[in-house]
């Protein structure tokens, strides 16, 4: 990639702010629906209907006329307007603080997540003590702002402890400040400012995540890894939706240069175009580029204005004349029945046309997702379902320069399993009155790495295949993962998903080295619509 010019980060942010606040006024929708699969599946009936042409694959959603009725119904679920007591209304019906005027709106809530559990296999007690907050609102119809923060302490089952201790990071959230102790300690925030100057354009600046796809997982860009600073522009042009996003990512494993031991950083540039060919059929094209901020000698490059290019990238050289990590992908969706859609993703990392569909070449790395999801299964109202298959070849997402691996804080930006796996997922959700029930089954087969060898599962390792490997899924220490989870919850307040929840989890990871089993039951008072993944 030819180097055009460089700008320091502070000047870029200042320039962005000037652009955002200088665009002319217009009335348009700017409010986001917080993304999590458990909230997202409640929109199945409205967004997968054959009479709607909603762009379903870019999340979080902006509330528009198609999903507004469903969203409002979710926020009013179980609300009893006859309750007059201020205390009772705040507990069951309303935000803790809620102000609505013609010029602006504002709300704020306290967000507890208090759980106690027992792992009967490991004979250990687990717990979660989270105190959080959220506040948000609108200014006119153009601006939306939101922030939340969480202070956490908790004890996890052994398999999650092993994960956290390995990378010193609580999955999808933040650094563990306990330094290897059994009780983990961490905190993190989410913040966004959304501005819609005209109906066709939304500009979002924040510290958040983005999800691309119609499935439970995404091989292209998922919400598994931790939050990152981002600037996201989304253009809605009828049947075509186009998104370009720039992100500032952390690499926790690259060699550090400064005396404070701060992580090295990298830039991410992402493009996604979704085309609703008809109400039933849509196709999308995805492109991502990861580039180091400084080379291995500590030479800082700044932000290359080439990354602002709205045109999709191909293989290129970054500002340091080092290869960037460039990925491409496709999405597809077809509504085979009303409220029922089949969907797919194809990820292409390294491409070798003569060996694309076989496993014989480690220079050919790709991934595939196929699935079906829908609402009102067997004509039962609010019985929603998903069946999904994912597979990613060894060494996909990795890079010859480890700092440009497709990760943030050492966690995959795609599937939590990384690469070198096959995965089957089934999920059922049912809601009746104030009760919600969820059941999930996962099966995965993958190849783990023996000591000092690289068989392609760990996307943080450099792209240096172990001699004799073929690129076949499952190479290495062949491992089977069986996972089952169920929850039953009673909704207390729909505004921030305050609920009592009973949960159970069975997990069995088995290979030639032995078996790691978990049998966990939890109960607690929970809130928020966060996605907190532990099904890996």
List each model region and its residues.
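Bacterial Sec-dependent N-terminal signal peptides
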Residues: 1-32
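Exposed, low-structure sequence patches enriched in small/polar residues
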Residues: 4, 10-12, 186, 281-536
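Outer-membrane beta-barrel channel domains
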Residues: 30-282, 287-293, 356-368, 373-391, ...
């Amino acid at each position: 990639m030819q180097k055009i010019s460089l700008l320091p980060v502070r000047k870029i942010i200042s320039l962005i702010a000037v652009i955002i606040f200088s665009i002319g006024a217009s009335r348009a929708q700017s409010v986001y629906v917080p993304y999590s699969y458990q909230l997202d599946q409640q929109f199945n009936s409205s967004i997968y209907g054959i009479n709607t042409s909603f762009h379903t694959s870019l999340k979080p959603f902006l509330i528009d006329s198609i999903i507004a009725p469903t969203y409002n119904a979710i926020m009013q679920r179980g609300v009893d307007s006859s309750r007059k007591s201020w205390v009772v209304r705040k507990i069951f019906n309303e935000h803790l603080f809620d102000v609505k005027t013609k010029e602006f709106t504002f709300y704020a809530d306290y967000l507890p997540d208090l759980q106690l559990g027992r792992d009967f296999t490991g004979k250990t007690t687990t717990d979660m003590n989270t105190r959080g907050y959220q506040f948000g609102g609108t200014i006119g119809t153009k601006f939306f702002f939101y922030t939340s923060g969480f202070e956490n302490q908790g004890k996890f089952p052994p398999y999650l402890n092993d994960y956290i201790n390995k990378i010193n990071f609580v999955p999808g959230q933040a650094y563990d400040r306990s330094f290897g102790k059994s009780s983990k300690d961490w905190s993190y925030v989410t913040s966004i400012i959304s501005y819609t100057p005209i109906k066709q354009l939304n500009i979002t600046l924040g510290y958040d995540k983005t999800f691309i796809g119609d499935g439970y997982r995404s091989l292209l860009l998922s919400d598994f890894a931790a939050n990152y600073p981002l600037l996201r522009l989304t253009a809605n042009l009828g049947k075509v939706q186009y998104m370009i996003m720039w992100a500032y990512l952390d690499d926790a494993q690259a060699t550090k240069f400064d005396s404070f031991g701060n992580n090295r950083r990298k830039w991410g540039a992402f493009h996604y175009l979704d085309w609703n060919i008809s109400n039933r059929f849509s196709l999308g094209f995805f492109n991502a580029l990861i580039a180091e901020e400084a080379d291995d000698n500590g030479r800082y490059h700044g932000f290359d204005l080439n990354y602002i290019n709205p045109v999709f990238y191909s293989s290129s050289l970054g500002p340091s004349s080092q290869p960037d990590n460039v990925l491409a992908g496709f999405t597809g969706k077809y509504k085979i029945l009303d409220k029922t859609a089949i969907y797919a993703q194809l990820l292409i990392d390294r491409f070798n046309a003569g060996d694309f569909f076989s496993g014989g070449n480690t220079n050919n790395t790709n991934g595939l997702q196929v699935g079906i999801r829908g609402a009102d299964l067997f004509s039962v109202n609010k019985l929603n379902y998903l069946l999904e298959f994912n597979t990613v070849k060894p060494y996909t997402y990795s890079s010859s320069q480890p700092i440009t691996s497709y990760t943030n804080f050492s966690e995959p930006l795609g599937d939590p399993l990384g690469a070198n796996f096959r995965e089957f997922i089934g999920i059922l959700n049912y809601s009746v009155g104030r009760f919600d029930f969820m059941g999930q089954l996962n099966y995965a087969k993958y190849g783990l790495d023996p000591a000092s060898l690289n068989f392609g599962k760990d996307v943080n390792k450099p792209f240096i295949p172990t001699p004799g490997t073929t690129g076949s899924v499952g190479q290495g220490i062949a491992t089977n993962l069986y996972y089952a989870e169920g929850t039953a919850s009673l909704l207390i307040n729909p505004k921030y998903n305050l609920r009592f929840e009973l949960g159970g989890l069975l997990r069995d990871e088995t290979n030639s080295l032995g078996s790691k089993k978990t049998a966990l039951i939890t109960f607690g008072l929970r809130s928020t619509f966060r996605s907190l993944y532990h099904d890996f």
